[in-house]
């Protein structure tokens, strides 16, 4: 019934508004982590997030007091977000690659939170944008890559569904993300309870190999362990970080 309900635009948006009224967030405890880290770092009240769903995105908990920029290439999700989210959130429909990121630099004078979850070129986008010096970085890591220091190869038309490997070939490992952030003065500050999302600040001190967590959702729907997931993708092309 709910699936049918979501196919009808007015009903879907009414449903979304009802969820927003109750409070929305990320897949796990991302919202609580970001609120805590933003307070601890004295972050400017601005966020930029790309790769989002209208009622499920990491920075949703910040909407009440932050100005935000949300970016995605899905036209339906963009239209829904514009219809249901508050006016302090700017919403842009764009397919991003390494050559068209400059508008992000111009969004705010200072960025409090930068959140990246695009199921593909996450590492390469973060590498390109680290010089904007956000107070807090939230980025998806791929737990199927275990404690290896690797990323998928940059592909401007990256489509996780078309890459194979049961959708487990995307992004970069937590160790690789941590190395990249460390080179710019950031340390690992938190990992979400459900796995997959990592948070970096200038004062983070966690060891990525011990802080790593598997994806609870991935294990649940696939019935596999992270080691089995790695066996599925290990022969695909990688960049060692």
Which functions belong to the PLM regions below?
Residues 2-13:
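Short hydrophobic helices that act as membrane-entry/anchoring signals
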Residues 12, 16-48, 55-58, 101-104, ...:
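Rossmann-like AdoMet/SAM-dependent catalytic core
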Residues 22-107, 116, 120-123, 143-146:
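SAM cofactor-binding core of SAM-dependent methyltransferases
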Residues 62-63, 129-133:
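Short, conserved loop/helix-junction motifs that constitute active-site signature segments
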Residues 66, 133-135, 186:
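A short helix->loop->beta-strand "cap" motif at the edges of active sites that frequently abuts
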Residues 109-115, 136:
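Short SAM/SAH-binding signature in class I
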Residues 134-143:
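Conserved beta-strand signature within the Rossmann-like core of class I S-adenosyl-L-methionine
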């Amino acid at each position: 019934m709910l699936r049918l309900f979501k196919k009808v635009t007015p009903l879907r948006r009414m449903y979304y508004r009802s969820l927003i009224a109750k409070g929305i967030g990320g897949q796990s405890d991302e919202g609580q982590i970001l609120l805590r880290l933003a307070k601890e770092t004295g972050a400017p009240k601005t966020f930029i997030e790309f790769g989002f769903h209208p009622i499920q995105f990491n920075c949703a908990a910040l909407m009440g007091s932050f100005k935000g920029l949300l970016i995605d290439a899905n036209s339906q999700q963009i239209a829904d977000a514009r219809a249901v989210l508050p006016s302090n959130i700017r919403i842009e429909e764009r397919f991003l690659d390494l050559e068209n990121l400059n508008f992000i630099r111009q969004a705010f004078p200072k960025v409090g939170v930068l959140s990246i979850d695009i199921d593909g070129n996450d590492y390469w986008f973060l590498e390109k944008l680290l010089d904007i010096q956000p107070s807090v970085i939230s980025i998806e890591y791929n737990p199927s890559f275990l404690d290896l220091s690797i990323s998928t190869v940059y592909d401007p038309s990256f489509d996780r569904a078309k890459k194979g490997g049961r959708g487990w070939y995307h992004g970069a490992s937590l160790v690789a993300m941590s190395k990249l952030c460390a080179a710019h003065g950031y340390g690992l500050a938190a990992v979400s309870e459900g796995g997959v999302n990592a948070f970096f600040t200038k004062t983070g001190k966690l060891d990525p190999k011990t802080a790593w967590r598997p994806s609870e959702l991935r294990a649940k729907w696939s019935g596999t362990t992270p080691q089995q997931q790695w066996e599925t993708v290990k022969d695909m092309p990688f960049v060692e970080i």
